[in-house]
């Protein structure tokens, strides 16, 4: 899963670079759209709703207090050790924020906290340039 993490970081850097050339029309402005993909079971501890809600309140909301969206998902990935496809429930957190260099550090802190707390191999991270308004 280290390859997935490295790929996510590269995508994030490309997304931040792409945001520098994106032109938005008023009232929208250049922003970063971030998706965090959290597995909730296989390969790590099962993450029930109570544990998820606590993690959201303690780790994610304080880092992005202006707002975010949480969706339930169903994910799958190939286990590099066993080669089989594993399916698991997941949570997708969508965050839209102004371009801000420290955003990557906040995202990495969230991913590392989740992996540590729930013994997960990885957290998917997608960062892309977007035009947004609220």
How would you describe each model-predicted region?
Residues 10, 27, 84-86:
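Sterically constrained small-residue positions within well-ordered secondary structures
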